[in-house]
Amino acid sequence: MEMSALEAAYKNPIASLFVVYGRRRVGKTTLLAEFCKGKHALYYLATEESIQANCAAFREMAADFLQDELLRSAANAGWEMIFKTLLAQPSEEKLVIIIDEFQYLGKADKAFPSVFQKIWDTQLKNENVEVILCGSLVHMMMEQTLSYSSPLYGRRTGQIKLKQIPYAYYNQFFPAMSEQERILYYAVTGGVPKYIELFHQGKEIYDDILQNVFTPQSFLYEEPEFLLRHEVNDIGSYFSIIRSVAAGNCRVSDIAVSLSIPVTSLPKSLKTLCDLDILEREVPPTEKNVETSKKGQYRIRDNFIAFWFRFVYPMRSFIESGHAEIAMNKLRSGFIPNHVGYVYEDICRSKMWELNAQGKLPFLFDRVGRWWGGKDTEIDIVAVDTNDRSNILFGECKFHQNTQMQLSELRQLKAKAAAVQWGKESRTEYFILFCISGYSEELHRLAESDPHIILG
């Protein structure tokens, strides 16, 4: 989909300005390298050096690209002159210009987005060119290119926020594994290409975790710190918030109490963590106004971050003192119930959207998610059509490794459904069940005879 968007812009005869952004390791550079194949493309990777050093490096890159020794020797040539020279080169092909890690230029010189805006307005926008600004510091990229206050606001013709690879594609990376095994790997790697590459060795999951995460010298041991340190200034306070959420404090008030800080100090930090796709705010799908609902809860959205804060961060003293086996024992006892089970619920909710689009469910819904309320009642899946209160679908997800789902679990789901008041007067209730180990014969017979029961 992302490649199609870039290709469509390339084939369009008018100029385009694309913003591509997303957290580190998700494959932005690989995407752009693939896109550039066979094209008249200039790729420049910005650095954290001064704006003058970057300009000189960009001039060298452009001189190599054009084979222009005059440009190379023009030590005083600024950004505008370099772009003017690039555009003056005759070519039947569309010119592609990519500036990767664009945010470093704005960090080195706060005026650079304004400089680039002028270059776009006076030179680029009327030429046969596709410009792609790419960056991995999400918050900074949003400020410099997408926010209303940015000089580039309104100039972009498209944007791509590159995210992790969905679970549905994991069979391409681990084709020899069973679905149960693939889910275990997804629960740790979370769709990040670099992490998948590290774990793609065909070992047993716990051996892979020990080698790649539970060893102080391993690539992923300090990964969350590395990711956050580049995005925020006060990494300690952000770590505390994530740790609190990982411990089960999901409401803003609970997070504040656990950290002994005022509630009013949290909204900005929570928004930043949501912008980074580390946290997300959940609201029961039956709520009338999602944005203003007081039932909002926060959860860790990133599988690896959730895994790390549950199993690595609390055990670092053991790991660093040479007793990783203690941390591994804790992992073995808690990995499935305290982590994989929740990841499996996410997978099932994603599958709900696929089934919905394919017309394989009793009605078309526009909201699906986890529901909570009543006296500590929680339902894994509730799906509704907000414009029609006559139907509602309830779902249960179980990652039983060796046990089939039983009729008793359907009965429990039906009992919990009674706590949901949405459309209760005249609604038709449907129930969908997901279980990684399958279903009992009783459930199969019931699903065959009752159209209100669906086995996912």
Please identify what each model-predicted range represents:
Residues M1-N329:
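Phosphate-binding site recognition
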Residues T292-G456:
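A cross-kingdom feature that marks ATP-driven nucleic-acid transaction machinery
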